[in-house]
Each structure stands twice: as structure tokens, then as C-alpha cells.
């Protein structure tokens, strides 16, 4: 649903309350309860419940899409209530007041790419660039979600430049690079084979005459896949 009042219909422009929130939470809770009850039933025809088994057993990560404080706290609390610890937040744009909470629960964050408008009309225009540094300063594992631009091809092309843009707001270049290499590998659980240049790991190497994280000066001259 549209989060703000639809001014073209005469509604107030401010944020709207979700009057279906309690109902939606109950539906989600019912689904989790049914799934947990059926996950050991080998004859169950409820494929959704069967698919939840690795989630409850800690084999699969849950990606929680949440931006504001209440979403984050409610979402994490809900999942923790079912013994689910492998949680990654996607978004967390307005999470500054809950960074300690995120850190205490040992949760990684995939932040939104910075080439976008602020989350809210009254948000700091620089929040999109600064939130990643605030998370890293708290010791939170951070990566970047490249989606949100015109196409998947453009998003992937811009990924190194997103990291470069974050580095312009106080993040060390090496740490910014890790946001698109080492950190996502750890979040995905594939860091034994990918993410860093170490003996025995797989890697794609490239050589750039300019800054590979800078949209203007980068100039890739060699690539080894």
C-alpha cells in the first residue's frame, strides 16, 4: 500500500497508519505456527510449510526487508521468537536509532544503493550516503543491494561506483571494496571459496588504470575470469 496520503484524492500528505497491521501479523504468525507444526511431516502436501523447515533448523538465512525502526524491531523480535537467528536486513535506511539493537543481535545489513532519493520527505538528503558508515562504525557487517535503478544491467554495472560513493562519505576505500567482495560472501555463506584474494579461493581479477570505484576515472584494461 502507498505509505503516504494520496493528495490527488484529497487525502492528507502525511504518513498513513496501516490499519491492517495486526491482521497481517496474525496471518504471518499463523503461517509460522502451521509450518513449524508440519515441518517434520514427510507426507505433508503443504509445500510452503515444507520449504520452511531449513529456516527453523538454521540452515537457511531469512532476508528481512525493513527500513524504519518499528519494522526492524518488530521483524527481528518476531523471527527471534521462533528461534531464527540467521537474519539479514535488506534496507535499514532509517535504522540509525536501532544500530545497537542490530549489532546486539548479530545481524548483517544489505543497504540500498545510494543513487536514490531519501526514504522520507523530511529525511536528511545525505542519509543515503552516510548510513553505511554509521553501521560499519558500529561493527555491523554491511553489503550493498545494487537494485533500484533502470535495469539489472545498469545496477550491476554501477555496483563498484556505489561502493565508491559510500567511500566519499568517510569509509576507507579498502573497507568500501569489502562491501562488494568480502562482506557479501560472508553474508551468503560462501566466504570459504570467494570474497578475498587467498590461496585456494576462486577469484575474478581485473586491472584498472584509474580508480576502479570511481565512475569517471576507472578504465579496465585487463580481466581474468
Predicted regions located by residue number:
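His/Asp/Glu-enriched, well-ordered alpha-helical/loop segment
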Residues: 61, 103, 113-115, 123-210, ...
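Catalytic beta/alpha-barrel core
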Residues: 63-67, 85-94, 114-120
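Active-site-adjacent beta->alpha loops and helix N-cap segments on the catalytic face
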Residues: 94-104
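Stable alpha-helical elements in mature extracytoplasmic
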Residues: 24, 28, 71, 98, ...
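Glycine-enriched alpha-helix->loop->beta-strand junction motifs that scaffold or abut catalytic
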Residues: 79-86, 103-110, 139-141
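Amphipathic coiled-coil/heptad-repeat helices and related helical stalk/stem segments
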Residues: 48, 71, 95, 127-128, ...
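Polyanionic/metal-chelating signatures
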Residues: 1-86
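Short acidic active-site motifs
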Residues: 51, 97-98, 131, 195
Amino acid at each position: 500500500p502507498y505509505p503516504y496520503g494520496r493528495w490527488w484524492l484529497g487525502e492528507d500528505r502525511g504518513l498513513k497508519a496501516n490499519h491492517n497491521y495486526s491482521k497481517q501479523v496474525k496471518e504471518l504468525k499463523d503461517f509460522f505456527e502451521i509450518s513449524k507444526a508440519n515441518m517434520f511431516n514427510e507426507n505433508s502436501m503443504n509445500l510452503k510449510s515444507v520449504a520452511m523447515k531449513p529456516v527453523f533448523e538454521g540452515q537457511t538465512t531469512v532476508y528481512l526487508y525493513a527500513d524504519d525502526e518499528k519494522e526492524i524491531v518488530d521483524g527481528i523480535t518476531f523471527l527471534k521468537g521462533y528461534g531464527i537467528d540467521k537474519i539479514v536486513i535488506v534496507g535499514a535506511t532509517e535504522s540509525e536509532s536501532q544500530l545497537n539493537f542490530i549489532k546486539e543481535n548479530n545481524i548483517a545489513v544489505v543497504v540500498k544503493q545510494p543513487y536514490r532519493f531519501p526514504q522520507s520527505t523530511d529525511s536528511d538528503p545525505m542519509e543515503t550516503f552516510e548510513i553505511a558508515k554509521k553501521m560499519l562504525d558500529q561493527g555491523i557487517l554491511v553489503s550493498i543491494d545494487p537494485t533500484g535503478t533502470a535495469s539489472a544491467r545498469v545496477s550491476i554495472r554501477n555496483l563498484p561506483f556505489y561502493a565508491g560513493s559510500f567511500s566519499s562519505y568517510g569509509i576507507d576505500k579498502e573497507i568500501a571494496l569489502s562491501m562488494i567482495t568480502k562482506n557479501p560472501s560472508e553474508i551468503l555463506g560462501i566466504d570459504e571459496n570467494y570474497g578475498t584474494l587467498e590461496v585456494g579461493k576462486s577469484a575474478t581479477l581485473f586491472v584498472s588504470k584509474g580508480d576502479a570505484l570511481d565512475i569517471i576515472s576507472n578504465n579496465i584494461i585487463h580481466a581474468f575470469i
